[in-house]
Amino acid sequence: MSGWRKIYYKLLNLPLKLLVKSKVIPADPVSELGLDPSRPILYVLPYNSKADLLTLRAQCLAQDLPDPLIPLEIDGVQLPSHVFIENGPRVFRYYVPKQESVKLFHDYLDLHRNNPALDIQMLPVSVMFGRSPGREGHGTPHLRVLNGVQKFFAVLWLGRDSFVRFSTTVSLRRMASEHGTDKTIAHKLARVARMHFSRQRLAAVGPSLPARQDLFKKLLASKAIEKAVADEARSKKISHEKAQQNAITLMEEIAANFSYEAVRLSDRVLSWTWNRLYQGINVHNAERVRQLAQDGHEIVYVPCHRSHMDYLLLSYVLYHQGLVPPHIAAGINLNFWPAGPIFRRLGAFFIRRTFKGNKLYSTVFREYLGELFTRGYSVEYFVEGGRSRTGRLLEPKTGTLSMTIQAMLRGGTRPITLVPIYIGYEHVMEVGTYAKELRGAIKEKENLLQMLRGLRKLRNLGQGYVNFGEPLPLTTYLNTHVPQWRDAIDPIEAQRPSWLTPAVNDLANQIMVRINNAAAANAMNLCSTALLASRQRSLTREQLLEQLDCYLQLMRNAPYAKDTTVPDKTPEELLNHALNMNKFEVEKDTIGDIIILPREQAVLMTYYRNNIQHLLILPSLIASMVMYHRRITRTELLHKISMIYPMLKAELFLHYSKEQLPETLDTLIDELARQQLICDKGSELVLNPARIRPLQLLAAGVRETLQRYAITLSLLSATPSINRGALEKESRIMAQRLSVLHGINAPEFFDKAVFSTLVATLREEGYISDSGDAIQEHTLEVYNMLSALMTPEVKLTIESVSMPAETSNQPEAPETPEPEGKTES
C-alpha cells in the first residue's frame, strides 16, 4: 500500500472510530462459520466504499482475522486481500473507474491452477448503515447503493445502527477443481456474489412499507372482504357504507403501523435495559433463520410463550441477527395506552381471543394475514395462544396456523417456513401472578398501572435464552402428507378442505415437539429440579453439586435432541450463579452449607423445573422402576415404560417414536450405569446401594406425573362406564385432595388441560372403547404397575376414594433404605 493511501485511510479512520459502533453477525464468526485464520482469506464486499472497508477492518482485527488492507503474497505474486463486486454510484458520474472484480477473481483462480496446494477462503462480507425499508411509492428504491456523499450522512446518522455480516466461505480450490479457472468462471463468481448480497440486503431490510390507508383500500377491494361486507349489511340490515366502515374500524383495530424509527429507538432502549437486567442473552442456531431469509422464504416464527417479555426479546434478537423484526400477533388485551400504540409501531397486530360469531372480523383478519405473507413480511405468533402459567408447553391453539395454510391456498405466496423457537428465562417477572391465577385468582386485566408495577420489580433476571428449532417448510410438509393440496387453491374464497384440520393438528404437534427439542437447561431450572425432588426442599451443598453433575452428564452424554442446549459450566459455577439469583437460602453450620428452597418459593420454582421436565422424564422413569424393583430385566423395563410412554409423549411433547423407544432407553440405561447409579449385570439392571441418593432424587422427577396417571386409571378401573367430562372432573378433585394431604406443591398437578390430554390419549391408545367404556383389564394392568411405584400412603389415599376393595390388594413395594435426601410424596 502506498504511503499516501495509508495517510488517507488513517485520516478517514478518525471520524469512523468516533461515529461507528457496528455489530458483527454472527457474534463469533470464526467458530460459527468455521473460518481458519491461518489460511489466506479474500474478503468480498458488495460495492466500493472505503467507509465499509475500514469498518470491516476494525471488526476483523477485533476477531483476530487477517487485515483486509494487507495484500496477500502467493508464489511471489502480490494481490489485494479484498475485492469490491461493484464500483457503486459516484458523486461525479462522468468518472467511472474500470471494474476490477472479475480480473481479480481470474487472477486468484489462475494461482490455484498453478498451485494445487493453495486453497484461499473467499469470505463474502456486507456492511450496512441503517435498515430503513422505505415506503411504497417513494421515488428512491430502498435497496439503493449509496454514493460518497450519501454514505457520509449515513455514517453520521446511522453509524451506531450498523452491522458487519460475515457469510459462509467459498473455497476457491473447490471452484477451480470443479468448474475450471477461465474468465467465464470469474464472471460467474461475480454474478453469484452480486445475487448473494442483494438477497442478504433484502433479508436485513425487508420489503417496502405500505401507507396504512393504501393497505386498507387494497384490503377493502378484495373479493373476500367485499362479500363479507355485503353479508354484514344484509344480516344486520345496515347500509353498505356502514358495513364498509365497520370493516375499516376492524382494520384499524388489527393492523400494525410498523416504523423503522420506532425500531431504532427501541433497540437503544432495550440494549440499555437488557444490559442492566440480564447477565446475558444466549442465542443458538440463528444461522438457520438467516439462511432461510436469504433463500427467499416467508418466515413464520412460532415461539413458546413464557412472558410478555417474549415479544420484545425475540424482536431484539432478530434485529441483532441482521434480520427484519417480524409482524407479531399480539392479544387484544395488550392494546391499551401507551403499550398498544408502541407495540403497533414495533410491528404488533392485534388479535381477539375468539372469532366466533363475527364473520366480518374473521374475514378481515384472514385477509390481513394473507396480505402480510403476499408482501413478504415475516410474521410471529404464539401457537399456545397465551402465556404458560405452569412452565410447560400448553396444548396448541390452531386458529392462526390454520389461517397460515389458508393463505397458502390463495396461491402466489413465497414458500412459507415455520420456525419453532424455545424462549427460556432464569426469572420470569409474572411467575408470582401465575401462581395466584393457578390457585383461583381472577386474571388481572393488563393496564398502565400493572405495567408500571411490573417494571418496578425488574432486577437481576439472570440469563435469557433464545434457541431456534428445526424449521418446518410448509410446502415440503404438504407435498409429503397431502400430495393433492394444490387442488384446493382458490384466490378468492377461504378454503377448508377435508384434510385441513388433521394437517393443522399434526403440524401444531410437530411445532410443539420441535420447541421442546430446542430447550435450554440452565442453572435455575437444574437447581430447582434437584431441590424440589428432595425431602424438605433442602440439600447439602455436596448433595446438590452431586445431583447437578448427574443431570449435566445425562444431558451431555445421552442428549435429548441435537438442538437442546446444556450449560458448559461446572456444577460449582452453576450453583454459585443460582445462589446469586437470591431464590434460595443458605444455612451454614459447623459441618457445611445446606441449600434451602423456602416454602413460599417452592411453588414458583416448579415453573422453572417444568421448563426442562421433558429432558429428564425418561431417566427419571428408569430410576423409579429400578428403585422399586431393585433388580429388573431390560425387557421387563421396556414393557412397563412402553405402557405409559404414549401418555408422557402426549403430555410433554416428547419426540421419540414408539420404534425409537428401545434404543433410547438402552442409551439412557448405559449412561446411568456409567455414572454407577445402577449396575448393569447383563440380563438384569440392579440397584446400586452406594449411589441410591442421586438415583432417588432422579426418580422423584416423575413421581407426581405417575400419581396423576394413577388417579385417572383408578377411576376408570373402578367405574368403566364413566363419561369423559366426569372422569376429568373427578380426576381433578382427587388430585387436589392428594396435593393437600401429601404436600404436593406443583400447580399443574390438578391442571384441567393435563387431565384432558391424558383422557384423550387413553382413548387413542385403546384403553377406552368406541362405546365410551373403559377396558377394565387394560386400565387395571397399568394402574397396578403405577401404584407399585408409589408410597403406601399415596396409594391408600387414591384407592380409598376410587377403587373397590377387591382390586386394591396388590402387594406392597419392597422396603428400600431411606438415605438423606429421599423424597416423601
Curated annotation (Swiss-Prot):
NCBIfam families from the UniProt entry: plsB, PRK04974.1
Taxonomic source organism: Yersinia pestis
Protein name stated in the entry: Glycerol-3-phosphate acyltransferase
Catalytic class of the enzyme: transferase
Domain of life: Bacteria
Biological processes per GO annotation: CDP-diacylglycerol biosynthetic process; fatty acid metabolic process; phospholipid biosynthetic process
Pathway connected to this protein: Phospholipid metabolism; CDP-diacylglycerol biosynthesis; CDP-diacylglycerol from sn-glycerol 3-phosphate: step 1/3
GO cellular component labels: plasma membrane
Name of encoding gene: plsB
